[in-house]
A protein has these predicted regions:
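A positional/architectural concept
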Residues: 1-53
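Charge/polar-rich, low-complexity and marginally structured segments
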Residues: 46-164
Length: 164
């Protein structure tokens, strides 16, 4: 299913490239180089889908994700602990739309009320994961992808805070 050179996304870590396929203990493993944090991950090929591994989105999907980022915030639990768990579960799905929702909602919340330390860390990590995917999908370098996302979020969150 995945070949060396494929651009993939691994939930919790972000986008990377399959750099190697190898047999170990009678099982095939994929080695993925995650670009934004210089991490290498090995995943058994036969459980890659279960682990949430998927190919990087294309330009068409980027447009849809931008729509999510620019959309209205969705209702989140008021309790910090519940909200944190709710967002963590969304990130864990590996779904780019769920990830974009978390990023958007935390950006709006940061603009309106500020974020707790834990939520700030989650927001930063979620943005890095999304930016790493934009990097491949839009053929940008890491810094340009992060700057692009930050600019979109600042404009959108400011608009939502003013409108809300």
């Amino acid at each position: 299913m995945y070949e060396v050179g494929d651009k993939v996304v691994y939930p919790h870590h972000g986008a990377g490239t399959v750099v190697r396929k190898e047999e170990r203990d009678e099982r095939e493993y994929l080695t993925i180089q995650i670009i934004h944090n210089d991490m290498t991950v090995m995943i058994p090929s036969d459980s890659a889908d279960r682990a949430g591994l998927r190919k990087v989105i294309g330009e068409e999907t980027v447009e849809e994700v931008l729509g999510v980022l620019g959309g209205d915030g969705t209702k989140m639990p008021k309790n910090w602990n519940r909200r944190f768990k709710h967002n963590r579960e969304k990130i864990k799905t590996g779904d780019v739309y769920e990830l974009a929702e978390v990023v958007r909602n935390l950006a709006i919340r940061e603009w309106e009320k500020g974020l707790s330390t834990g939520e700030k860390q989650m927001y930063t990590r979620a943005k890095k994961i999304l930016a790493s995917e934009f990097m491949y999908a839009l053929d940008k370098d890491e810094d340009a992808a992060e700057a692009y996302l930050d600019e979109l979020l600042a404009d959108s969150a400011a608009d939502k805070a003013v409108a809300g």
